[in-house]
Amino acid sequence: MAAQLHHALYELLHEAAAAQRALLLAIPFSLLLLPLLLRYLAASASASATKNDGAAPASDPDKLLSLLPSPPMKLPIIGHLHLMGDIPYVSLAALATRYGPDLMLLRLGAVPTVVVSSPRVAEAVLRTYDHVFSSRPRSLVSDIIMYGATDSCFAPYGDHFRKARKLVTVHLLNASKVRSQRPAREEEVRGALDRVRRAAAAREPVDMSELLHSFVNNLVCRAVSGKFSMEEGRNRLFRELTDINAGLLGGFHIQDYFPRLGRIELVRKVACAKTRRVRKRWDDLLDKLIDDHAARMATHQDEDDDKDFIYVLLSLQKEYGLTRDHIKAILIDMFEAGTDTSYMTLEFAMTELIRKPHLMKKLQEEVRRNVPAGQEMVTEDNLPGMTDLKAVIKETLRLHPPVPLLLPHYSLDACEVAGYTIPANTRVVVNAWALGRHSGYWERENEFVPERFLSGDVAGGVDLKPNEFQFLAFGSGRRMCPGVHSASATIEAMLSNLMYRFDWQLPAGMKAEDVDMTEVFGITVSRKEKLLLVPQAA
């Protein structure tokens, strides 16, 4: 977190220089922030003194929060920010073990944040009291990128969220729509396999990170914009912007931790300059696609086309009262969530399997046993009996949840959880990474053991749609990721075919223990190093 803070300050200074503001060029931005922070601290102290004249009422939010378990190493102004580390979900899990195994309070700058680290409390927050914790805290960055948080992921709870959520779950990501995309999935899988086949013939390693990212990105682009997705290199531009979004939405932004700074126009302009430039690029790209679709609809040229997401949104625009900005926000959601979850799960699955060849061999045998002899590739008709395949995917999601810290929740009212009262307007973060490695629920919790999902114990009954809260690959409740059907279909189709068509080895000279498992944190998690594997036709 210290490195992220330094980077954030550097970004602010860089943006100021780009804007050619003489004052900011003359004064280091950190010095500019100091009086603002001191002013903030003085105002907070004054407000606290006024509030504490006489006995504090039982409903006082600060008093209620002070009763929660909390690490003692809180510093002036920054609070517990210095404890977050470069990989926050790992740091938070370690802190929870010492100071709050179920839930704990962190003061992140000026923002009190409750961290949930046990399945029992996760169930209380995401199921029992889901109606209380179903909102989102506001963020300048997500407000800009998502057109005032009018998408379905970052929108605060209310009528617009319910409308956007219904639109996405009923019309875009329902099981029927996912089934209708099967031909596109099979075509994109075939294209990826052809790339691997050529590498195998040349005895060259394959950059699996690039291959899998490209495969999922192309598939999402087709679902969103149909045959327009490949024109003018749009699929590559979508991928570039999606990657930038992930960094921005998961990055450290000082105004999120000191909200009063975010009210200062100068800070808002400088801190969010890059975000506004990225939004402009999204505008240019999405406006062109929407205009193309609208023109075809007006002249009935679309009647024989597959009904991609843009077509569906335009056809429902009046019924749902959607503005153009609403449509663009929902489309960005589809790109962001649809790409990262699937490709990262595929990459982590291949990484874990190459480190345990006996598990890869077992999976290959199952896949090849379930496909008729001579069949070119695995089809979705062959998948139902592949229990090892499903176990590998579940275990990958347990160890490497794509969103290790679920997007923050925000309490709409005061609520008692695990014997503590969480006040209204409190940020709550569920550490999905910690749940998946909770030693009270999992044996050998830090090991890749897919067979745990084949047994008759608790783990064997866990599904991607959570019934037990020790495994939250896609979240839960009103805010559960609606793309579970699409992600499952994409991951199963690709992983099964990689196992069916090829045998895999590490590049010459590498051993399993040489594979770097270092992760990089953003709004989603990724591997630091590319995965290079050598294929051989089976």
Swiss-Prot record:
It is found in: Membrane. Its EC number is 1.14.14.153. Its cofactor is heme. It is an enzyme of class 1 (oxidoreductase). Pathway: Secondary metabolite biosynthesis; 2,4-dihydroxy-1,4-benzoxazin-3-one biosynthesis; 2,4-dihydroxy-1,4-benzoxazin-3-one from indoleglycerol phosphate: step 2/5. Pfam families: p450 (PF00067). It is a single-pass membrane protein. It catalyses: indole + reduced [NADPH--hemoprotein reductase] + O2 = indolin-2-one + oxidized [NADPH--hemoprotein reductase] + H2O + H(+). It comes from the Eukaryota. One of its GO terms (molecular function) is heme binding. Its main location: membrane. The chain crosses the membrane at residues 22-42. InterPro entries: Cyt_P450, Cyt_P450_CS, Cyt_P450_E_grp-I, Cyt_P450_sf. Keywords: Heme, Iron, Membrane, Metal-binding, Monooxygenase, Oxidoreductase, Transmembrane, Transmembrane helix. Heme binds at C481. Belongs to the cytochrome P450 family. Catalyzes the conversion of indole to indolin-2-one. This is indole-2-monooxygenase. It comes from Zea mays.
